[in-house]
Amino acid sequence: MSSLIHLEGVSHAFDAAHPVLDGVDFALGPGERVALLGANGSGKTTLLHVMVGLIRPRTGRVHAFGRERRAEADFVEVRAKAGLLFQDADDQLFCPTVAEDVAFGPLNLGKSKAEARDIVHATLDRLGLAPLENRVTHKLSGGQKRLVSLAAVLAMEPEALLLDEPTNALDEPTRERLMEILAGLPQAMVIVSHDREVIDRLVTRRVTLANGALT
């Protein structure tokens, strides 16, 4: 089975004395749903960011979607194929309205305005978010923002999803709704979560990051 994302010997440190990642090897195959576990501050978010080029490792190689990725131009393509759901929805949503936030990715991928509009409608309908289409994004609740963030990621039709604490700080109805949505998606996933139910219901494999090493 070929990997969608494959890390080889990845190391990174924000200061020389304390490596966050130390020779990490990791592979995500098609259809896999991998839980990335570890204590707060262990480097889980850093590892997700390495996968999509938001952080460049000091050593090691990043292979994604068939080839090694090194330059920013390489990772622009990766970020279109591996949708990263940020831990804080406010880091992801920056357009005035929900429709504009969801259309942003497809437009950047070269879709016409008409095509992007169709994608927005289809994606919001699919997630049950059509009533939010013309809402001002910053006025939404935290749970609504989280769902709109997922819609913005899915609108790019990624092959993989990298989910950073997807259910964090959600009320129970929104949390359950999000889990149902994720359970029905076909994409491979890496899920960072401390939510035991999310892990038990969604993942096919678990790995743990501790002291810079992945086991």
Predicted regions and their residues:
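Conserved ABC ATPase signature
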Residues: V136-L140, Q144
